[in-house]
Amino acid sequence: MAETVNLPRDSTLRELVAVQKASIIASGNAAAIDRLYGSLVRAAKSVEEVNILFVDWWNICWKEGVTTRNELCGRWFGTVLDDNRVHGTKEPLFATSQSAIGEATDDSVGLVCTPSTEAAANRDDFAKLPQFWALEVAAEKNADGTHTIYAVEFIDSYDDVRRSKHLCWVLQKNTYTKEWDEGGYRYFKMRCHPSTGYETWPQGTDKNGTVYGYIANPKYAAGFDSDGLIGCGSGRPPINYSSHSDNVGLWRKRGAQYAGASGRLLKWQLAMIRLKYARKGNSGTIEGCTGYSYQYAVSVGESGVKRGSTGRQPVRWVERHYRR
């Protein structure tokens, strides 16, 4: 006699999951809530879904007058965002090949990233993953080496995050990375958990040696705040014609704990390009203005001759004359 197997309907399974979720949330157990939302993030199909989960989790965990933005950001990046994936890339050393094109390795194989433009929001398979998901905040470094987060993307207004008197940072999980040469190639790998030879990002540790669950990098190039101090935020007038030493002096006026961006920022930027695009650099992938110099060769034999530019060539460039 054949055995009859009754399979639960999808609606029944969803109801059971909802009941379990409600039970965990009602318990108020922070560790259990973080594990629950960690599993939901790993199952998310898009970065928009992760954004919604973040807001949901934040509203559950936030207790006015008790919790702080620093605390919840530390929990989200340090505990909720977690996976066992290893993201990697390898590029040929110059002696192996002069090509800037590499290849994805490990769990990065098959993932696609195409830069978005003003006209189109293109594909980024990495954006929703725990090691790459990013969050804008408004924050300040404190004189004692700590920092304070004043506003958080998706929770506070974008004006408070990007245009306030504070600095606009972008947070990302403080992962473990390893880089080495082998067999004519340069390898770079990143993961959530410690492993032999892997190190966390320097910008995830403050001067007191405290390691955070997130790293912080500036979202914008430096500009002047309304009070005349140097800052980092949307809508600031840019700082031009300023030397490195002058820039350090401008940051010192904001506070002795500031000195401006370091080489760590460039290292992180290049690492993200390598991991997402499997290329040695941004050329041909993410570019702004690529041509500033317009030169026109002419043959001249005169000296002391004055020349004028015609209407066909608007003077948007510095005209220089070279004698060949």
Question: What are the roles of these predicted feature ranges?
Answer:
Residues 65-67, 73-176, 180-234, 314-315:
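Short acidic-hydrophobic catalytic motif
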Residues 159, 163-166, 198-321:
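Short aromatic-cysteine micro-motif
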Residues 8, 13, 20, 34, ...:
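Short, intrinsically disordered low-complexity segments
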Residues 1-48:
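Short, low-complexity N-terminal tether/leader segments at secretion or assembly junctions of large
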Residues 324:
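Active-site-proximal beta-strands of protease catalytic cores
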Residues 56-68:
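Acidic, serine/threonine- and proline/glycine-rich low-complexity repeats
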